[in-house]
């Protein structure tokens, strides 16, 4: 089996693949101070509860935006599974041309999303990943990654507002019944949720205009289910797009090495 690990600022998502099939997945809180031994114990418990043994894992692919945890999981792979993990980054060749000024600066999760999106939907295609930050990734008609946009995630944007405005308070992040709020709660939900949906719609329209194509837009990430229903420009929601991209990156790298 192949273990794929997507390390984000808020969550660590772990998946187990048997061939092309995602057999199990877990979303865990990003705990930067947790040791390799602690992660190993937790993953063992989760895998056993799902009917799997980590002894079946023969390879690991990691996407990470948290350098300290990259090292933690690399040590876990080496010590407990006796494998050298693939650490995805924008400077490596996965068969996806990366045509930006500094390829090494492109987040590994964005590379994985692009790989999986092209495999599933062809090119051109746009991927919007809703996480701690919201990223827009653009693949042109030639199948090349050409950049995108990064916006504050809806959760941290909302937290910044309520923390800095003395008379505002936290409310449930959900779409209100109308844009014109009749009270503070509805007004906050309108400005935050509906306003964020319009941010996404507007950027998708601008990106399509610059591309010169009505490229399909795919939503992914932990908060996709909140915003995607409010954005008719989306063609699909793919909750595990990054995990599938990690699997593909691993397979492509091993094919190129003749493994």
Curated annotation (Swiss-Prot):
Catalyzed reactions per annotation: (R)-pantothenate + ATP = (R)-4'-phosphopantothenate + ADP + H(+)
One BP term from GO: coenzyme A biosynthetic process
Cofactor notes: A monovalent cation. Ammonium or potassium.
Residues involved in ATP binding: 6-13, 132
Subcellular location as annotated: Cytoplasm
Protein name according to UniProt: Type III pantothenate kinase
Family membership noted in the UniProt record: Belongs to the type III pantothenate kinase family.
Reported function: Catalyzes the phosphorylation of pantothenate (Pan), the first step in CoA biosynthesis.
One family name in Pfam for this protein: Pan_kinase
Originating organism: Thermomicrobium roseum (strain ATCC 27502 / DSM 5159 / P-2)
Residues annotated to bind K(+): 129
Record bears the keyword DNA-binding: no
Sequence positions that bind substrate: 107-110, 184
UniProt xrefs under InterPro entries: ATPase_NBD (IPR043129), Type_III_PanK (IPR004619)
């Amino acid at each position: 089996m192949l273990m794929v690990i997507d390390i984000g600022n808020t969550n660590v998502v772990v998946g187990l693949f048997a061939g092309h099939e995602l057999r199990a997945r877990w979303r865990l809180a990003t705990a930067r101070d947790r040791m390799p031994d602690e992660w190993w114990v937790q993953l063992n418990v989760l895998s056993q509860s799902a009917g799997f043994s980590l002894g079946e894992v023969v390879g690991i692919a990691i996407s990470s935006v948290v350098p300290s945890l990259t090292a933690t999981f690399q040590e876990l792979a080496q010590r407990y599974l006796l494998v050298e993990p693939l650490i995805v980054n924008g400077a490596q060749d996965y068969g996806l041309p990366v045509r930006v000024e500094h390829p090494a600066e492109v987040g590994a999760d964005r590379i994985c999303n692009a790989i999986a999106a092209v495999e599933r939907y062809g090119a051109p295609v746009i991927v919007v990943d809703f996480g701690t930050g919201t990223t827009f990734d653009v693949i042109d008609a030639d199948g090349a990654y050409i950049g995108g946009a990064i916006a504050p995630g809806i959760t941290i944007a909302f937290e910044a507002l309520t923390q800095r405005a003395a008379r505002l308070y936290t409310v449930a992040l959900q779409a209100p019944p109308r844009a014109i709020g009749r009270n503070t709660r509805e007004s906050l939900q309108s400005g935050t949720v509906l306003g964020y949906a319009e941010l996404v719609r507007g950027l998708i329209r601008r990106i399509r205009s610059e591309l010169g194509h009505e490229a399909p837009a795919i939503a992914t990430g932990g908060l996709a289910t909140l915003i995607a229903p409010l954005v008719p420009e989306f063609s699909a929601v793919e909750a595990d797009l990054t995990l599938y991209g990690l699997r593909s990156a691993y397979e492509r790298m091993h094919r190129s090495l003749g493994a």
